[in-house]
């Protein structure tokens, strides 16, 4: 069995399979053959033999060159929705790695919450300006908050959202959530679940709003001036979903005017962010370069999940994190 993989050529260390990891994989696959796929390359050998594809960069042109393709496993939570028509037509199975990021992303969200609420991020600015003293810190003292027993709205109560909710619940926080499917049973640690169409009402009065939404026709620019103006003045907005769900011009305005207290942004519309971006000048904003899911044991988890599914695939059993076609059409 041939397995095509595009995870060898990334210039970023945590996004590629290194030699040590590859040796572990080869020991596991035994009789199967894994071949490197470079999507940008026109001519490649053995694509017509590939039955399983493992990676993030598969596209419609590649699928056309792989007539025997039966299963695609994305090494990410996001899915390339441009391949929707082809995989539906050919009935190709699609899985992703949504559960691998929950601990890392929830840790990032908590770091945003504590840094912005306690003003520790601001101390880095004071340090750079050689003003690291109580007198200068006093300028933001009115925005300093006690995290415990505050309220949080989690917009997207999936695998990652539930992990965040559980951690915040342990801090005594009041948990509210947005869930696309309103027919779910409410977890005991969540006080109330809203439908997405009630988002404006849901953000009102919450201390923290955490966005986990993917970009779809219904969510593009959903966080705009109307939503930001519905938030309480000392609220903190956190985005670890997708940059395209936020109208960045509107967000920039409310942050400049201190209409909300601050923001923690791991994702932007354009990545990497331009060093000329006005967001970088704001002291009430923390920006990270889309690294919320990074962790030093990622590949151990990734390999474990892929090979568990490979065993299931060979046994013709149900695959973990199998996506339905409606999810794929939306890109998640």
What are these regions (language model features)?
Residues 1-95, 202, 224:
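An N-terminal-biased, well-structured beta-alpha scaffold segment characteristic
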Residues 92-151:
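Phosphate-binding beta-alpha-beta segment of Rossmann-like dinucleotide-binding domains, i.e.
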Residues 170-188:
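NAD(P)-binding Rossmann-fold cofactor-contacting core
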Residues 161-162:
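N-terminal Rossmann-fold NAD(P) dinucleotide-binding loop
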Residues 182-278:
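Rossmann-like adenosine-cofactor binding region
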Residues 75-76, 93-100, 197, 241:
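Short beta->alpha connector loops at strand-helix junctions that form conserved
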Residues 157-158:
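Glycine-rich Rossmann-fold phosphate-binding loop(s) that bind the pyrophosphate
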Residues 234-236, 240-332:
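Rossmann-like dinucleotide-binding domain for NAD(H)/NADP(H)
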